[in-house]
Each structure stands twice: as structure tokens, then as C-alpha cells.
Regions:
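Glycine-rich short-loop/terminal segments
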Residues: 1-55
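Short alpha-helix boundary/capping and kink motifs at helix termini
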Residues: 37-89
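Short loop/turn hinge sites at secondary-structure boundaries
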Residues: 76, 104-105
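Short, hydrophobic/aromatic-rich beta-strand segments within well-structured domains
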Residues: 83, 98-100, 109
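Beta-hairpin (beta-strand-turn-beta-strand) motif
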Residues: 87, 113-115
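A sequence-level detector for short glycine-anchored, His/Arg-bearing signature motifs
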Residues: 87-103
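Short hydrophobic/aromatic-enriched beta-strand-loop microsegments
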Residues: 106-113
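Amphipathic, charge-rich alpha-helical segments that serve as recognition/docking helices
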Residues: 115-153
Length: 153
């Protein structure tokens, strides 16, 4: 039975955020500190349910239709870095990013994944229905990160 695992998609592929988190937890990549303003272009993406953009929420925070997103922003734990691709597109962490803006933070900790690393997180083409099960994700991670895993044996 397929499981519901979050993913990010671009115009070609779906990328597993679960694999990204596993990579972060195991490999402890370096964090980078960026200016919050460097990521503002991300506010215009339809990244949330019902085609809601972060900029819509920021511009109309009293609107009841944004209640769920505002709750998620309020509850977001900003101690965790957000995840970016090499173009600074947010892959995971929109709510944490918006919380930084609301709290007038000037900098944000991020992980930046280059194109080579991003290939390891691909789980399918953009418009394919994902039928992967938990064991499939474990197998993918083991296969794609075998060299790293060998260091821990």
C-alpha cells in the first residue's frame, strides 16, 4: 500500500523531502546563513493548498481563509533550517521562512542542495502518480547513498 510522503516538484520531477531529511540527519551537511530578503521571490509561488501564495497571506493576515496557513506559520519551528536548491528555490520550509519575515529576522539558516545532489532525491516524473511504499524509500536511500552509509559501518 502506498504511503503519503511529502515531496517537492519542479517542472520535470518529484523529489522526496523524506529522503532529504534522511540525508540531513545522516550526513549533517553544512548550513549556510542567508539574508531573508535574498529569498523573497519565493513568496510568489503557489506552494500551499488552494493556490495560496505566501505573499497573499502576508498581505492579508486577518483574512479567515488563511487561518490554517497562519496556524502553521505560528507553529513553525524556526530552529530548523529551510532547504533550498542551488537557485535558492525553497524546497521545504515555506512556513518557517514566512515566520522569519513576520518576526523581522534579517538572516535565515539554510541547506543548499546542488543539482547533482537533487538527482538523488528524485522519486518520479512530475505528473506520475507516486506508488512508492516505505520500503521503496528505504531501498532508494540505501542505493543512492551507499558510499556515505559505508562510513557508518
Amino acid at each position: 500500500m502506498p504511503i503519503n510522503i511529502d515531496y517537492f516538484s519542479d517542472d520535470k520531477y518529484q523529489y522526496s523531502t523524506a529522503l532529504m531529511f534522511a540525508y540531513i540527519n545522516l550526513c549533517k551537511p553544512n548550513k549556510t546563513k542567508l539574508n531573508v530578503d535574498d529569498l523573497k521571490f519565493n513568496l510568489d509561488y503557489n506552494c500551499w493548498a488552494n493556490n495560496v501564495r505566501p505573499i497573499d497571506v502576508l498581505n492579508d493576515m486577518k483574512n479567515k481563509k488563511y487561518k490554517d496557513e497562519l496556524t502553521r506559520i505560528k507553529n513553525a519551528n524556526i530552529k530548523y533550517p529551510i532547504i533550498l536548491d542551488s537557485n535558492y528555490k525553497i524546497l521545504d520550509g515555506y512556513h518557517r521562512y514566512v515566520k522569519h519575515i513576520i518576526e523581522n529576522k534579517k538572516t535565515i539558516n539554510v541547506y543548499i542542495f546542488d543539482k547533482k545532489l537533487m538527482k538523488k532525491f528524485i522519486i518520479g516524473k512530475r505528473h506520475e502518480i507516486n506508488t512508492l511504499e516505505i520500503n521503496d524509500f528505504i531501498e532508494l536511500f540505501n542505493r543512492r547513498f551507499k558510499k556515505i552509509l559505508l562510513k557508518y559501518e
